[in-house]
């Protein structure tokens, strides 16, 4: 009888932990309101922590294998204007897909950047970051794309979180578009 009770308690505990992990996996990694809740110590930080002046849109495309999709957040006026926009490629951390960083991507795009990410669960080689940039560069040369001649290829940056930090170094030193 005691063994049965211990078994039930163990089963319930496992189910509660599983439910908690499922709930946590559904939350964004960067809270949607982070630009309003983070406190800074200076005027410059306060200025750039706020959202920029651009409305933001998002485009997606299918990516190979585990990468699932490429995502680009961009200033909405990109679709109608003649300007080009600097690019930020973001390499996500282990098991934290780019879709968990939407608030960060929207924030950067509101300041006039094209921000790229993908769903790669293991970014360390930099290959998925490079492929995501290659996708945008292909779109930049495609007259049928919203990104046609919109990416400022002289101003491309890369950033990463956790394992994505390693991906940054590998993307710029080991991947085909590292020299950009």
Go through each PLM region and give its residues.
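Solvent-exposed loop/turn segments at secondary-structure junctions
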Residues: 78, 93-97, 115, 120-125, ...
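Membrane-interface motif at the C-terminal end of an N-terminal transmembrane signal
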Residues: 16-33
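N-terminal Sec-pathway targeting helices
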Residues: 1-15
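Active-site signature of alpha/beta-hydrolase-fold catalytic machinery across serine-
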Residues: 103, 170-174
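N-terminal cap/lid segment of alpha/beta-hydrolase-fold proteins
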Residues: 28-84
């Amino acid at each position: 009888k005691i063994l049965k009770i211990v078994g039930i308690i163990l089963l319930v505990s496992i189910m509660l932990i599983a439910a908690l992990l499922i709930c946590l996996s559904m939350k964004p990694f960067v809270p949607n309101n982070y630009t309003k809740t983070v406190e800074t110590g200076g005027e410059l930080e306060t200025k750039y922590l706020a959202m920029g002046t651009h409305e933001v849109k998002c485009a997606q495309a299918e990516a190979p294998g585990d990468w699932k999709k490429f995502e680009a957040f961009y200033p909405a006026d990109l679709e109608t204007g003649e300007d080009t926009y600097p690019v930020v490629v973001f390499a996500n951390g282990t098991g934290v897909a780019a879709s968990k960083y939407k608030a960060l991507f929207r924030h950067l795009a509101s300041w006039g950047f094209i921000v790229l990410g993908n769903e790669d669960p293991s970014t360390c080689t930099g290959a998925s970051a490079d492929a995501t940039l290659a996708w945008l560069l292909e779109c930049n040369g495609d007259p049928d794309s919203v990104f046609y001649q919109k990416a400022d290829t002289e101003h491309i940056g890369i950033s990463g979180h956790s394992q994505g930090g390693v991906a940054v170094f590998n993307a710029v030193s080991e991947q085909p578009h590292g020299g950009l």
